[in-house]
From Swiss-Prot:
Keywords: Aminoacyl-tRNA synthetase, ATP-binding, Cytoplasm, Ligase, Nucleotide-binding, Protein biosynthesis. This is Leucine--tRNA ligase. ATP binds at K601. A motif ('KMSKS' region) lies at residues 598-602. It catalyses: tRNA(Leu) + L-leucine + ATP = L-leucyl-tRNA(Leu) + AMP + diphosphate. Coiled coil: none annotated. It holds the Pfam family tRNA-synt_1_2. It is found in: Cytoplasm. It comes from Acidothermus cellulolyticus (strain ATCC 43068 / DSM 8971 / 11B).
């Protein structure tokens, strides 16, 4: 029993005469903290079905903002619903705490990154508690804690052992402002996604994860996610992985012993190749350049290195190049074609070289017309000559000027020419991917050190597991400003070490890991966040994972989500997890915008979350977030009215306080009409919450509140047991969206905390049967669905219900709806 000094011991009857959200919040927050009602059980004998609800963990850049308020309100609806249904729910919280923003912010304030980061974490933690998110706080983690990044380093070493972590010198994306490298996924429109600086190229020796080894599996396993992840995200990942089928073709370069291989999706156009292009910044171009062209080539390469990949691939920009003074030999006709270095071919894409077919590729045509190179049509599409029109003909047609495959169509031409190349030993069928290996090195301080030692005799040597973590040196007072090399390189005592293999003098690797490595496995650590002996408890992971519902922004589609899928597959191959996809279902929430635009300081349209919470209260803000519309859509805060929702909450609070029937009064003795309304609402809200139509669920809760208000004022009155039944159901359902008010209502109705564990109400089928009729839904006169609806359903409600039915959506199949005939409550006919 709670002591008198505890919040529970001090609870007294509600005596306030007005709805005071601040007083209600102050009353219940310490009670919840003491009760800790959302702690998940790891007990394998616990008979409850398990559910894992996960929000993408936040970055501690400051206090919570409006985007956090929306995303976490959405995830909390799911978690609280599962708690009410009696599941054993894991709903953890942590912080993605390493990274550039914290380091830069700390440098600007003359602080150590750790001080800045942990201060922000505590601020956000207090705000999350106030915002009443149903977290299991016992599982809290921070990726910048040595107890966490020890296991991030352990993960790196497991990839290193399997040949999936490796080091190579190559051109990388370089942010001149942050003075560090960027993965391809972190370059947006040619600029750094973090600071907006124009990205350039720089050749560095860097660490990579061999994600390309898993490219096909990443594609194939998307079948497991169909219908459970947004199609937009799956499409983005498919496009980013970029599988292409075609052929590898070997070209002999005169004066070079080894052939140069290109990949093409159209080997049938080989007869139209009139020149050969190599990426200007590739080692191959420098190798084969003729002496007489060397000066021109080197001057040209200096120009190209100033361009971003986005610039080089732009269709708007004129293509440039330089002749290398060499010729390649076309393997199908023996023709000598000139070899050029150009900016529109990238060294790290494909093989870094292409056969140029200007008649049938627009970039090749633009280049050919600029430099007066031949244009030969080899596919007759019935269109004009590209050399005259300036437009390449890229469609299908009949092959002409193509020797062995004249007169064939595309499919037959590809098959024949590929077989011929295989027969003569000059090519083979193949597949290539757009996906590049994951660049994980960063030249900054605030990250997990790479656990590798560089020994003059032994080379790259892994730090033994028993010596993990490789701790960051403190470096307090050191200049951490970006200089193009890691600040760790200046920590001489830290850098100098002993080789674990030979015992000789060696140096630590001075780069730190991309923070996406930290977040690629955090969902596993939550299962045993304080285990000092292993990254995660395998048995517990098998109990909880994969995550049942993941909530977060679409901006992570080709970053965190792809990387986590890759790491999960690696761990599966190691036998540590028994699933291949980490997140069974994904919901991408929309953005919170203002006046039609994303919030930003430059536009002056930012909305301060703290001010909104102080003005309207937590529940009104949370309710606004879920009532604004479908969770996937943006919320324009300028159009929202949290004050009106605050008034609704006050009405619910008053209803709970006016109920006079005793706790446990038999509902069957109550007004049957009101009971039917209550049970219909329970059924509909259940269906709506399970289909993530939270805004409509809130509308149904509002309708029940209106029915209760009417019943109290002009109906059976506050003593009727049906009023109590409805008010109790209202409090439980409202707890998903407005937990403080719901808890207060639960107390006013005579119950002990907490309403979150009251149990979800079950609709009585007998009451529902008494008030339902069957509505036939037709599409173009053909019956596609039968709905059970209320006899009093409005035309608008019936129209919405019919259009939302999956069978009707499938029958419409995206076609424009011409008109909808509604004869409530028994018929809807959709004409498309």
């Amino acid at each position: 029993m709670a002591g008198l000094g505890s919040p529970l011991g001090r609870l007294t009857a509600v005596t306030s005469e007005i709805y005071d959200f601040a007083a209600i919040q102050a009353r219940w927050l310490p009670v919840w903290t003491e009760l800790d009602p959302f702690r998940a059980s790891d007990d394998p004998s616990d008979p409850r079905e398990r559910r894992y609800m996960l929000d993408m963990f936040p970055y501690p850049s400051g206090d919570l903002h409006m985007g956090h308020a929306e995303a976490f309100a959405i995830g909390d609806v799911v978690a609280r619903y599962w708690f009410q249904r009696g599941y054993n729910v894991l709903h953890p919280i942590g912080w993605d705490a390493f990274g550039l923003p914290a380091e830069n912010a700390a440098i600007q304030r003359n602080l150590h990154p750790a001080d800045w980061t942990y201060r922000n974490i505590e601020t956000q933690a207090a705000s999350f508690r106030n915002y009443a998110i149903s977290f299991d706080w016992s599982r809290r983690l921070h990726t910048c804690d040595p107890e966490y990044y020890k296991w991030t380093q352990w993960l790196f070493l497991r990839l290193f052992e399997r040949g999936l972590a490796y080091r190579k010198a190559s051109p990388v994306n370089w942010c001149p402002n942050d003075q560090t490298v960027l993965a391809n996924e972190q370059v947006v429109g040619g600029t750094c996604e973090r600071c907006g600086a124009q990205v350039t190229k720089k050749t560095l020796t860097q660490w990579y994860f061999r994600i390309t080894e898993y490219a096909q599996r990443l594609l194939d396993d998307m079948a497991l996610l169909e219908g459970r992840w947004p199609e937009r995200v799956l499409t983005m990942q498919r496009n980013w992985i970029g599988r292409s089928e075609g052929a590898y073709v070997d070209f002999t370069i005169e004066g070079r012993a080894e052939p140069v291989t290109v990949f093409t999706t159209r080997p049938d156009t080989l007869y139209g190749a009139t020149f050969f292009v190599i990426a200007a910044d590739s080692p191959l171009a420098a190798e084969i350049c003729a002496p007489e062209q060397r000066a021109a080539f080197e001057a040209y390469v200096d120009q190209v290195r100033r361009l971003s990949d986005i610039d080089r691939l732009s269709t708007e920009r004129q293509k440039t190049g330089v002749f290398l003074g060499r010729y390649a030999v076309n393997p199908v006709n023996g023709e000598r074609i000139p070899v050029w270095a150009a900016d529109y071919v990238l060294a790290d894409y494909g093989t870094g070289a292409i056969m140029a077919v200007p008649a049938h590729d627009q970039r090749d045509l633009d280049f050919a017309l600029t430099y007066g190179l031949p244009v030969r049509v080899v596919v007759d599409t019935g269109e004009g000559d590209p050399a005259v029109t300036g437009v390449a003909t890229e469609g299908d047609g009949v092959h002409i000027n193509s020797g062995l495959i004249d007169g064939t169509d595309k499919a037959e031409g590809i098959a024949r020419i590929t077989r011929y190349l295989e027969d003569i030993g000059k090519g083979r069928a193949g597949v290539t991917y757009r996906l590049r290996d994951w660049l994980v090195s960063r030249q900054r301080f605030w990250g997990a050190p790479i656990p590798i030692v560089h020994c003059p005799g032994c080379g790259e040597v892994a730090v033994p597991d028993q010596d993990l973590p490789v701790l960051l040196p403190d470096l307090r007072g050191a200049d951490l400003a970006p200089k193009g090399i890691s600040p760790l390189a200046g920590a001489a005592d830290w850098v100098q070490t002993t080789c674990p293999r030979c015992g000789g003098s060696a140096q630590r690797d001075t780069d730190t890991m991309d923070t996406f490595v930290d977040s690629s496995w955090y969902y596993l650590r939550y299962c045993s966040p304080h285990d000092p002996s292993q990254p995660f408890d395998v048995a517990k992971v098998r109990q909880w994972l994969p995550v049942h519902q993941y909530v977060g922004g679409v901006e992570h589609a080709i970053l965190h989500l792809l990387y986590s899928r890759f790491i999960t597959k690696v761990l599966h191959d190691m036998g540590l997890v028994d699933f291949v996809e980490p997140f069974s279902a994904l919901l991408n929430q929309g953005q919170v915008i203002n006046q039609g635009k994303a919030m930003s300081k430059s536009l002056g349209n930012g909305v301060d979350l703290g001010e909104q919470l102080a003005t309207y209260g937590v529940d009104a803000v949370r309710l606004t977030m879920v009532f604004a519309g479908p969770p996937e859509e943006d919320i324009d805060w300028a159009d929202m009215n949290p004050g009106a929702l605050g008034k609704f909450l006050a009405r619910v609070w008053r209803i709970a306080g006016e109920v006079t029937s005793p706790v446990g009064a038999p509902p069957k003795d109550g007004d049957p009409a009101l009971r039917r309304v209550t049970h219909r609402t329970i059924r509909e809200v259940t269906e709506l919450v399970e289909s993530f139509r939270f805004n409509v669920a809130v509308a149904r809760v509002m309708e029940l509140a209106n029915a209760l208000r009417k019943a109290i004022d002009t109906g059976p009155g506050p003593a009727d047991p049906a009023v109590r039944e409805g008010a109790e159901a209202l409090a439980v359902m409202l707890s998903l969206f407005a937990p403080y008010t719901a808890e207060e209502c639960w107390a006013r109705l005579g119950h002990q905390p907490t309403v979150a564990k009251a149990g979800w109400p079950t609709p009585d089928p007998e009451l529902l049967a008494q008030e339902e009729v069957t509505c036939v839904v037709q599409v173009n006169g053909k019956v596609r669905e039968r709905l059970r609806v209320s006899p009093s359903i409005s035309e608008e409600e019936l129209r919405a219900a019919a259009l939302a039915a999956p069978a009707v959506e499938k029958a419409i199949d995206g076609r424009p709806v011409q008109r909808i005939i509604v004869r409530a409550p028994k018929l809807v006919n959709v004409v498309v």
